A protein has these predicted regions:
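A short glycine-rich, Lys/Arg-flanked "PGG" loop and its adjoining helix->strand segment in the class I
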Residues: 115-127
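Conserved class I S-adenosyl-L-methionine
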Residues: 1-36
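Class I SAM-dependent methyltransferase SAM/SAH-binding core
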Residues: 46-89
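Class I SAM-dependent methyltransferase "Motif I" SAM/SAH-binding loop
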Residues: 42-44
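C-terminal lobe and adjacent flexible extensions of AdoMet/dcAdoMet transferase-like proteins
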Residues: 200-250
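SAM-dependent methyltransferase
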Residues: 132-208
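Residues lining the SAM
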Residues: 102-103
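A short acidic, Gly/Pro-enriched loop at the edge of an enzyme's catalytic core
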Residues: 91-98
Length: 250
């Protein structure tokens, strides 16, 4: 379960503290040449797609947050289209040269939906296309676990204080994240928003197995978007590049 129904401009400010847009863009651009058709599953406020659109890619983004999709459409972007909906429900006859899902979007899906989403994604890819997945390892969750966190995010004369609470459901293997966002705008007005999301705990072997079952072959693994070596002990994020397995090889 996820909400993420708060103004997209606030998410953009918080995202800057967690992500390296330049590294992500360079990584994605290395997977498909300019002019390629790109699909972003879990596109959020469209940050990655706007940058790829500027580089000449033809882009489609899918996100379940109405607030984020509204912001992304207002923000514009050359050659970028946005669809409001869940990744597992997205249907199209178009084929893409690159499909990606970043910022732990894969962890937001229930375990019983993962294989279906990957099988559907396989159908979205062109025969020579590539899939890029970024997800959090099991130990990444364990090491970063804090029951209560207070963080401040600043940008565009806006101050966001994020009060986060984490809890664990061991039976479902999920992390529940509950957040209260206290926002002071540039004009001094203060507003309050609640946000929550569940994250499934995943492991590298589990995701590799699901990819194989869905008809993919893993071609590369990294520990980040600067193509750092993938950690062998399950810490930190894992970035996987996969290609459709030829039918004769299945």
């Amino acid at each position: 379960l996820t909400s993420f129904e708060f103004p997209g401009e606030y998410y953009e400010i918080m995202r800057r503290d967690f992500r390296n847009l330049a590294a992500e863009t360079e990584f994605l651009a290395s997977c498909a040449p300019p002019g390629s058709r790109v699909l972003d599953l879990g596109s959020g406020t469209g940050t990655n797609l706007r940058r790829l659109g500027e580089l000449g890619y033809s882009c489609v983004g899918v996100d379940q947050s109405a607030s984020f999709v509204e912001y992304a459409r207002r923000a514009g972007g050359e050659g970028v289209e946005y669809v409001h909906g869940r990744a597992e429900d997205f249907a199209t006859d178009r084929r893409f040269d690159l499909v990606y899902s970043l910022f732990m979007t894969l962890n937001h899906l229930p375990h019983d939906k993962l294989r279906t989403v990957l099988e559907t994604t396989r159908c979205h890819l062109a025969p020579e296309g590539r899939l890029v997945l970024e997800f959090g390892h099991l130990l990444n969750f364990v090491e970063s676990y804090q029951q209560h966190t207070v963080a401040h995010h600043r940008g565009d004369d806006i101050l966001i204080t994020r009060l986060a609470r984490q809890s664990v459901n061991p039976h479902a293997a999920t992390w529940r994240n509950e957040e209260t966002l206290l926002v002071r705008d540039a004009d001094g007005q203060v507003s309050l928003y609640d946000n929550f999301f569940d994250q499934s705990v995943l492991t590298g072997p589990e995701v590799r197995g699901l990819l194989a079952e869905a008809g993919f072959t893993v071609t590369a693994e990294y520990g980040g978007f600067r193509k750092e070596p993938a950690p062998g002990h399950g810490r930190g994020p894992l970035v996987i590049i996969a290609a459709p397995t030829p039918k004769e090889a299945i």
